[in-house]
Amino acid sequence: MRIIPRTMSTQHPDNAKVPEWAKSEVIEGEDEVKEAFLAYSMYGVHEVMWDAEGKDVDTHVVRKLLSNYPDYFREHILGKDLFLTYRLPNPKVEGADRKVFAETMESIPITYDLAEKFYGNGITIPVFEVILPMTTSSLEIISVARYYEKAVANEDELELYDGVKVKDLVGEIYPKVIEVIPLVEDRDSLQNINNIVEGYYKVIKPKYMRVFLARSDPAMNYGMITAVLSVKIALSELYKLSESLNFEIYPIIGVGSLPFRGHLSPENYEKVLEEYKGVYTYTIQSAFKYDYDYDKVKSAISSINNSRISPARILEKYEEDVLRKITILYTERYQPIIESLANAINDVSVLLPRRRARKLHIGLFGYSRSAGKVSLPRAISFVGSLYSIGIPPELIGISSLSNLDEKEWDIFKQNYVNFKHDLQTAARFLNWESFKLIKDIWKISEDTIAKIKEDIDYAESVIGIKLGGIDYDSRKHILMSSLFLLSFKEKILQESKKYLYEMALIRRSLG
């Protein structure tokens, strides 16, 4: 049995600080290849997710890793000891990148040939897994697996002319199959994930399966509590499915440093391991790596790598029903407030520092409502924008919990263990002064502001959260938030950008 990685380094651009080795503030090109090597060698991460989306993606990453760092990779075999996993564009959703999907799939046999030359025959398959984002059905991942088998691996048998086959020209094509990891990002698909996995299992018959649960995008689209509870439902469903099919399933969770995006940081990783029992692999995003002291980062990654995997908490049907009800109530409260803040979020997001050369993923937000569709930035910029205007997104929608009875509240607390801790971490950055300023700048309605204040009051009076600056860092952040809003109001944008950067350094994450 292969090693299942415990940590996966990603290219999420959530870092406030720029790493010393980067040639510029924007990590791109050869720097991303170097970053992959350093993730393995300096940080001790088991796996690197290589984002194959956007026009400047480098499909020659394996060639560059093996040729630039031969001594390291002779000792640490790519595909056996360490792993490189492609994140594909979803051709059903990201129409402009359909051919990038094809190009990336076609590059997998090239990596195989390179490894044959570097390691010797039959030693390793360096890239054998791909991640499909925004998966909503088993058909999508079945199609990806079959596309590779039929359109890539079997093309060596095509006859070109008069008995001459493709393999006579370019050699035989390996590997013959790849493993597909569904990345599930929307609430309904997370809560019904067993249908996606079981459908794939019945057709493809894999020996095991890795399943990637998003934690960040669902929070942006439906609210933090909905995201947490949807992941808990998914983990329970996957565990039950694994038992019933007698088939190993290894969940991955995509988590960032701030509470809204998962709260996995070098200072909070133990609580995240406790929260998400049943998860095998945790994403190590850029803020985790670059916004904390190196020794603390390396120690935290080592601890995650060596931590014991606890079984997922299995939900009874009545518990699952309660959690589903909470996610609906929470989302109904959260979404209209976010719609009303959309202009503010979009205006602030374009001023945040850029840390990657390309858009990483397209946005999911844009559910249909009577007012039409709301366009929002990616989750990192979304979170950074709300923190910067002094309204941490973790607080939005919280008062919907007032609808729960005592039994429902107990079930909620049992299934979101670190709820109060996450909320308290975020609430330190609440800026009371921002309400008047955002009303002046973006004409935010009294009704929206009243709803946010109701949520804040509930967090303070019912949950017992201390709001606003409670230490030097949070007080400084609140002051910077007011200065940012004042400079933005006066259109002094260079100063606005400076305050945004200073706040990100205090949070140790852009968003």
UniProtKB/Swiss-Prot annotation:
Catalyzes the irreversible beta-carboxylation of phosphoenolpyruvate (PEP) to form oxaloacetate (OAA), a four-carbon dicarboxylic acid source for the tricarboxylic acid cycle. Belongs to the PEPCase type 2 family. GO terms for molecular function: magnesium ion binding; phosphoenolpyruvate carboxylase activity. Its EC number is 4.1.1.31. It comes from Saccharolobus solfataricus (strain ATCC 35092 / DSM 1617 / JCM 11322 / P2). Mg(2+) cannot be replaced by Mn(2+). Keywords: Allosteric enzyme, Carbon dioxide fixation, Lyase, Magnesium. Its cofactor is Mg(2+). This is Phosphoenolpyruvate carboxylase. NCBIfam families: PEPCase_arch.
